[in-house]
Structures are given as structure tokens and as C-alpha cells.
Swiss-Prot record:
The keyword Transport does not apply. This is Succinate--CoA ligase [ADP-forming] subunit beta. GO terms for biological process: succinyl-CoA metabolic process; tricarboxylic acid cycle. The gene is sucC. Pathway: Carbohydrate metabolism; tricarboxylic acid cycle; succinate from succinyl-CoA (ligase route): step 1/1. ATP binds at residues 45, 52-54, 94, 99.
């Protein structure tokens, strides 16, 4: 889960990472009030989960509360690379002597953690890596040893930070590591990490990505979910522990196992090319179980998308046998009743497939078409969606 900047800075405060005071608002009047409360020039910053805010006009300096009001009026509603600005962070402006870069991330390729540090902050780190690779330190981190002050100082030194700020930077870097580990993050990035004229080190911007697989350890992380910006169908799926991602097509997809669902998306997209460009409407993985309740929840989510014209249920029976899946489909249709109003194309294979097919055949539901192969089922679902 990617966090907004103001949420990341909330975690900075929790872990004693020095930053500038500020608050979030969704109105221009609120921006003026916060600027008045701070009593100093402020930065008015669009809160979107995308880079390039400054170049798009989403970050402005305001010398007075009235300036903050004017900038907020201009930024709210701004479209930044497809992200519409609904919230603003109004934070105290800081005098900047130098800008640095620091991040901790999960290095999947090398199966380790990585610290990245550079004296070249305030610009895209990809640009630094491409044009000044010698100025970007990439330091592997042993999770068992962590990052103490000595190692944090070494990271800063390898990033070519000036000698006079190494000790102060080390304190901040070690606290960022504490955040990274303590909050189960996969990314903690500060760009810029600034040096003020009096040699303070401040995190002026922040990017944090949290590992959703660790949510059970962090019940407080639920507050970071931007429910207003999340698709309501995705929220409904999450309530049932279903893995759902809404797409922009017309064929609803339900499968068990991420690999099978991804393959199903491909075959439906291919089949749709000869049926007017029909495409998959979603990714929905119901996991290893396909009980009536799970299937009903999945169908309810998929059919809640007004773009869906047909549904392709593609299940391979493993631990959960095909007869159990078929029974689940029949009972799910009974549970949903009139809400199940789109044609279903069902393909079953695997454990006890013949019994599963018999159950669906005997049920003789008018919306269900049983098809033996995945390619044929994808073609039929695309055909029905294009009708």
C-alpha cells in the first residue's frame, strides 16, 4: 500500500524522524487557516500517489496565508498524470542549504534489503543513477544486524554527504530504518533530505510503501486506506478476503489461483479480438476454496460492475474438488437470485471434474453454459459479452 506524503510524514513523526510541521486539508480556506496557524511561509503540496507534482504545478510556495488560499484553489482538482488532487498538505517552508537522497527498499532480485544514498537530492533518483552513478551509493543491509548509528554513518559517507553533517544524517537514517522495519515497509524514501543553513537535517518529502501481507501486525494501518479513492468493488472484495482488481473490459473473470486467473485474462483478451475488441473486466482470485459463500461473494462483486456483460468462471479442482466448486456455483446463484442476471460460462477441470460437470448439467440453470476447454470458454464468454 502506497501512502500519501502526509501519511508518510505521520510515520516520520511516530519514529522521531525530523520534518517540518504541517497539516492536511481538502479546502482552500483550510489551507489559509493552517498557514495562519503556522505563522511562517508554507509549501502547499498536492497529495497524490505519483511523482512529478512540482513540474505539474502541484507544489507551490506561499509567503502569506492569502497566497496559500490562492494556490490551494488552483491545485485542488488539478489532474496530475491521471490523479485528481483532492487533498493538500500545508507545511512550513524550510531554508535549504543542500539536498540529499536516502531510501531503504526491498531488493527482490538479490533477496536482501538495500539502502540508497546520494548527495544529489531533489531530482529524480533514476536520473542520478543514469547520469551520475558514482554519486549514488547502493548499500546492502543485513536484516539480522540492522542499521545502527555506525552503519548509518557509513551509508551517508558512501553517499558522499559532507563530513560536517554525517553524524546528524546518521541519526535520521537510523530512525528511517527503524520505521522501515517497525512498520513492515517495502520502501521508505526521502527526497529531498535537506541540510538547513544551521546544519539541521530534515525530511522535507516522504514516500512510504507498506507490505499489505503484514497488515495483521498493524491494525492501525487501516487508517491509511483512502476509501474514497478506492474502487467500491475492490473494497467489497477486500471485505470477503478476495483478490480483485477492476479493469476496463466486459467479461467478468473468476478463477482460483493467481496464475490461472492471469492466463484467463490473456485468453479472454485474445478471444475478444474477434468479437469487437471485448476485454477482461477484472482480475478476481477466489483462492483455494470455492464454497457457495465464496462463489456468491465473487459473483456479487463481479456483477456489481455495470460494464460486465458476461462472466467466465474458470476453476481447476485441486484440494477443492470440482464437484464442490459446482455445488458452490449452484448455491451461489440461489443466494444471489435476481442479482445474478448475466450469462455465466463455466469451465471446470481437475479433481472430480466429471461429477462437477454432472452437477451443473443437472441444475440446468438458464444462465450457465458449461464449456470443456479454456479456449472455447473464453471465446463463448467474449461472444456473449459482444452480443
Amino acid at each position: 500500500m502506497d501512502l500519501f506524503e502526509y501519511q508518510a510524514k505521520g510515520l516520520f513523526a511516530k519514529h522521531n524522524v525530523p520534518t517540518t510541521p504541517g497539516r492536511v486539508t481538502d479546502t482552500a480556506e483550510g489551507a489559509r487557516a493552517i498557514a495562519t496557524e503556522i505563522g511562517h511561509p508554507v509549501m502547499v503540496k498536492a497529495q497524490v500517489k505519483i511523482g512529478g507534482r512540482g513540474k505539474a504545478g502541484g507544489v507551490k510556495y506561499a509567503a502569506t496565508p492569502d497566497d496559500a488560499y490562492e494556490h490551494a484553489n488552483n491545485i485542488l482538482g488539478l489532474d496530475i498524470k491521471g490523479h485528481v488532487v483532492k487533498k493538500l498538505l500545508v507545511a512550513e517552508a524550510s531554508d535549504i542549504a543542500e539536498e540529499y537522497y536516502i531510501s531503504f527498499l526491498l531488493d527482490r532480485a538479490n533477496r536482501t534489503y538495500l539502502a540508497m544514498c546520494s548527495v544529489e537530492g531533489g531530482m529524480e533518483i533514476e536520473e542520478v543513477a543514469a547520469t551520475k552513478p558514482d554519486r549514488l551509493a547502493k548499500v546492502p543491509v543485513d536484516a539480522a544486524k540492522g542499521v545502527d548509528l555506525a552503519f548509518a554513518r557509513s551509508i551517508a559517507e558512501q553517499g558522499h554527504l559532507p563530513a560536517e553533517v554525517l553524524d546528524a544524517a546518521a541519526v535520521t537514517i537510523s530512525k528511517l530504518w527503524d520505521l522501515f522495519v517497525g512498520e513492515d515497509a517495502t520502501l521508505v524514501e526521502v527526497n529531498p533530505l535537506v541540510r538547513t543553513p544551521d546544519d539541521q537535517i530534515l525530511a522535507l518529502d516522504g514516500k512510504v510503501t507498506l507490505d499489505a501481507n503484514a497488515d495483521f501486525r498493524h491494525p492501525d494501518h487501516v487508517e491509511f486506506e483512502d476509501r474514497a479513492a478506492t474502487d467500491p468493488l475492490e473494497l467489497k472484495a477486500k471485505e470477503h478476503d478476495l483478490n480483485y482488481v477492476k479493469l476496463d473490459g466486459q467479461v467478468g473473470i473468476i478463477g482460483n489461483g493467481a496464475g490461472l486467473v492471469m492466463s484467463t485474462l490473456d485468453v479472454v483478451a485474445y478471444a475478444g479480438e474477434k468479437h469487437g475488441g471485448v476485454k477482461p473486466a477484472n482480475f478476481l482470485d477466489i483462492g483455494g476454496g470455492a464454497s457457495a459463500e465464496v462463489m456468491a461473494a465473487g459473483l456479487d462483486v463481479v456483477l456489481g460492475d455495470s460494464q460486465v456483460k458476461s462472466v467466465f468462471v474458470n476453476v481447476f479442482g485441486g484440494i477443492t474438488s470440482c464437484d464442490a466448486v459446482a455445488t458452490g456455483i449452484v448455491k451461489a446463484l440461489e443466494i444471489l437470485g435476481a442479482e445474478a442476471n448475466k450469462p455465466l460460462v463455466v469451465r471446470l477441470d481437475g479433481n472430480n471434474v466429471e461429477e462437477g460437470r454432472r452437477i451443473l448439467t443437472d441444475a440446468n440453470h438458464p444462465l450457465v453454459t458449461l464449456v470443456p476447454t479454456m479456449d472455447e470458454a473464453a471465446d463463448k464468454a467474449a461472444e456473449l459479452a459482444s452480443a
